[in-house]
Amino acid sequence: MISSDPEAVSASAYREAMAQLASAVHLVTTDGPGGRAGLTATSVCSVSDGPPTLLVCLNRNSSAYPAFLRNGVLCINTLTAAHEGLATDFAGRVPQAERFAGPDWGRLQTGAPVLAGALVAFDCRIVDRHEVGTHDVLICAVEALAEISGAESLLYAGRHYRVLPRPDSESD
């Protein structure tokens, strides 16, 4: 069905369509006066490289949401294939208080938790916020980066985790 009428697209049809898109998987973390919190997200996107800016969409009904707003900082930790269990834990299978118990966590500039071994970590300050439907679009200035090389990326598509192998360096 093709329709340009926004009322003709149900929430369930939209969610089903979005489930077909492959997305990188991230742990979005924060720490500060609002407490330490984290969640799994796939709605992350580059905005600009001058200055380095990205966006992340967070559900305002998430138990972690108030901490992000109060702290004003976050780290987007892009996951490798080895982190599938963490992605599930941070998606709500484990209570907020227990999510940081497992792996090693560090800090960069903002103080938000940085996952050791993440494919890349974007340490950010929230500089703007837009309410759209059930979510907030957070515009984030990237203040520091941490990255590793050679790891396979974790993707989410069709409601399942998938692995994107690294390109063979000889075929580049």
From Swiss-Prot:
Species: Methylorubrum extorquens (strain PA1) (Methylobacterium extorquens)
Keyword Flavoprotein assigned: yes
Lineage of source species: Bacteria, Pseudomonadati, Pseudomonadota, Alphaproteobacteria, Hyphomicrobiales
Its EC number(s): 1.5.1.42
UniProt GO molecular function: FMN binding; FMN reductase (NADH) activity; FMN reductase [NAD(P)H] activity; riboflavin reductase (NADPH) activity
SUPFAM superfamilies for this protein: FMN-binding split barrel
Family: Belongs to the non-flavoprotein flavin reductase family. RutF subfamily.
This protein's UniProt keywords: Flavoprotein, FMN, NAD, Oxidoreductase
GO biological process: nitrogen utilization; uracil catabolic process
HAMAP family: RutF
Reaction catalysed by this enzyme: FMNH2 + NAD(+) = FMN + NADH + 2 H(+)
The keyword Flavoprotein appears for this protein: yes
Stated role: Catalyzes the reduction of FMN to FMNH2 which is used to reduce pyrimidine by RutA via the Rut pathway.
Stated name of the protein: FMN reductase (NADH) RutF 2
